[in-house]
Amino acid sequence: MKKEDVPQDLKYYKGSVIRDLTYALDDKGHYEPVRSDGWEPKTEALDIFLETLDDQEERDKMELLVPTEFKGYELKINHRHAAHCENGTISSLLRFYGINLSEPMVFGLASGLFFAHLTFVKMNGMPVTAFRTIPGVLFKRITRLLGIKSASQRFLSKEKAMRKLDQLIMEERIPVGCVVGIYELPYYPPENRFRFNGHNICIIGKDEESGDYRVLDSNATEKVTITRDDLIKVRFAKGAYPLMGQMYWIKSIPEDLPVRMRTDKPDVEFLRPLVLKSIKDTCKNMTSQPKWFPYVGANGIQYLSRKMRTWEKKLGKRRARLYLVQVIRMLEEIGTGGAGFRFVYGAFLQEASERTGIAELNDYSLRITEIGDMWRDFGYKASKVFKRRAGESYTYDDLADMLEKISDAERSFFLDLLKAVERYIK
């Protein structure tokens, strides 16, 4: 996707600090983060999804609060806007320790790109379609890869959860990642809230007098503030997957790591094997799944294609429409940076090429960008199906045909990329 093609269909974000971010190519073929204020197929999918919920009256009473002022103690970490909350939070935690990794590098080094269509796992009563690894895995993978000691914890007691948070921020003076529900986040637009217990934020300070906390939310354009009561609500959000105050943090890092990970003078001998291992793992995750488990990787895309052809007949028109909406929301809405993280991964391959000197990786960056464009086209055509506009004749079979082509393209891409990186692995 080129910068000039980044959609700006502003709808839900008026008056809010929350904005979309994607990665797009400039005139010279270089990836840049670009702010995007929404995409029509994505917001249409969200509209249809929200119509199925029974909380419209409750959401209508919610107010949008944008508290950005703060007078308490705050760790010195600059705010960075990111496409995906978990990538952005991990990047913030690392940045505090002098490790300057971009969002794409965090995602790529953690082998975050994936695909799964899990008919046996339900969200809102419908199969889960995922374009990345399960939440929490990114932090575990990248800290293990870099030799960083980390910790995570859940709580039965709200008071114990808040005491532990205060101890880390105010006594140990370190930032903390928290997993929260977005439904009651006060700075999210009410009309854009739904019960999703998987948002990541970074807590970097506290005002002892008011009890407010300072927050880096990478989906926001600036730092925000949240009250103690609101933070407790979102940390202990109820639902199908209760959070239990889940939090994670870095305990210590190797002394020489910040120097080795410098962007101006990268330690190529240190970084290159990490990049190659991460890419190899991603390629295997996408192509080496057993035939008896067809739900994941490139095979999973083909599996979704087969299932999609049967939706209208087996589920009826209304249910089939909701299944399709669910796929598009996972593809575009849940902080993917567009096209199910494919643009983010393209940005990773390009940056990895520059930082390791492996020029070939840039060619693969452009190839997966083309695949990302195929996913974007699929999302656009899918919106024509679930909006059912007069005179438009796209069908579920048409969409399934597109998925088959995407499956073939991704399988070929990751097999070729695997062969390429194996030539560099000693």
Protein language model regions, located:
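Charged, long alpha-helical assembly modules
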Residues: 324-426
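Short helix-capping/linker segments at secondary-structure and domain boundaries
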Residues: 95-104, 349-356
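Noncatalytic regulatory segments and standalone regulatory/sensor domains
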Residues: 208-334
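Intrinsically disordered, low-complexity coil/linker segments enriched for acidic/polar
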Residues: 2, 7, 29, 35, ...
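Acidic, low-complexity, intrinsically disordered interaction modules
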Residues: 17-36
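Conserved active-site-adjacent core of cysteine acyl-enzyme catalytic domains
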Residues: 60-101, 111-260
